[in-house]
């Protein structure tokens, strides 16, 4: 078993099986592209359990991802994919960067979900880019762009319904995709409070990493509460 890649939140290892990786979730938490960074015991476990729950439920509803199975509280087995260097963001309500960028009032619901692409390049601070930029950079062609948007909106519909079952609002989220050995585009990376913005419908309390970004509460307590809500479904 060899370390293939290490990022801010995960380590990726090779396995004895071709085209299969083992992912280990770390206890590190970052914000602002790593400008703020801490180690919090139990964070990796929570994100792995939450992501595994979402990927398993999405699979039952027909949405394929790189996820194969949960190996332990902090580990997953996944299909090897070549990550497409885009963060695909879906916004249902105005919050975060779009409020600063375009002047929307925080919490305003969009008439329909908005899909945005961000170029995954730390040196450039992951800039927002258009479909034409995606093509000029050689990241994806028209067909792949359409497929990324199609899957992102399907995932959004599924997640919105799950959040609704917990009396929560899915404000926005970011996901990543990769291509398998056959060129199929698959959901990859994770879906967790690290990558979603989630509010309580009544109190507007955060159930996401904003509690860490804004120093408004305990990240571990918040993620634990969210996981407990998932388990109760």
UniProtKB/Swiss-Prot annotation:
Domain of life: Bacteria
GO biological processes: 'de novo' IMP biosynthetic process; cobalamin biosynthetic process
GO molecular function list: ATP binding; phosphoribosylaminoimidazolesuccinocarboxamide synthase activity
Pfam family, one: SAICAR_synt
Xref: InterPro entries: SAICAR_synt/ADE2_N (IPR028923), SAICAR_synt_PurC (IPR033934), SAICAR_synth (IPR001636), SAICAR_synthetase (IPR050089), SAICAR_synthetase_CS (IPR018236)
Pathway per the UniProt entry: Purine metabolism; IMP biosynthesis via de novo pathway; 5-amino-1-(5-phospho-D-ribosyl)imidazole-4-carboxamide from 5-amino-1-(5-phospho-D-ribosyl)imidazole-4-carboxylate: step 1/2
EC nos: 6.3.2.6
Catalytic activity: 5-amino-1-(5-phospho-D-ribosyl)imidazole-4-carboxylate + L-aspartate + ATP = (2S)-2-[5-amino-1-(5-phospho-beta-D-ribosyl)imidazole-4-carboxamido]succinate + ADP + phosphate + 2 H(+)
Keywords, in A-Z order: ATP-binding, Ligase, Nucleotide-binding, Purine biosynthesis
Family: Belongs to the SAICAR synthetase family.
HAMAP family referenced in this protein's UniProt entry, alphabetically: SAICAR_synth
Name of the featured protein: Phosphoribosylaminoimidazole-succinocarboxamide synthase
């Amino acid at each position: 078993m060899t370390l293939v890649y290490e990022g801010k939140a995960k380590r990726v290892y090779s396995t004895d099986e071709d085209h299969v990786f083992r992912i280990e979730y770390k206890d590190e938490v970052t914000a602002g592209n790593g400008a703020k960074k801490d180690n919090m015991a139990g964070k990796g476990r929570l994100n792995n359990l939450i992501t595994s729950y979402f990927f398993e439920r999405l699979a039952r509803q027909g949405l394929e991802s790189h996820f194969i199975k949960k190996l332990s509280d902090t580990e997953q087995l996944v299909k090897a994919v070549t990550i497409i260097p885009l963060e695909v963001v879906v916004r249902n309500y105005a919050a975060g960067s779009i409020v600063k960028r375009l002047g929307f009032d925080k919490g305003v619901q969009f008439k329909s979900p908005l899909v945005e692409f961000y170029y995954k390049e730390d040196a450039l601070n992951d800039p927002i880019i258009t479909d034409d930029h995606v093509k000029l950079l050689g990241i994806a062609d028209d067909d792949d762009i359409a497929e990324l948007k199609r899957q992102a909106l399907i995932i959004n519909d599924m997640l919105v319904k799950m959040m609704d079952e917990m009396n929560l609002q899915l404000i926005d989220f970011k996901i990543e995709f990769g291509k398998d050995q056959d060129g199929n585009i698959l959901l990859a990376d994770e879906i967790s409070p690290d990558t979603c913005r989630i509010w309580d419908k009544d109190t507007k309390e955060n159930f996401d990493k904003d509690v860490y970004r804004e120093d408004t509460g305990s990240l571990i307590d918040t993620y634990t509460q969210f996981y407990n809500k998932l388990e109760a479904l």
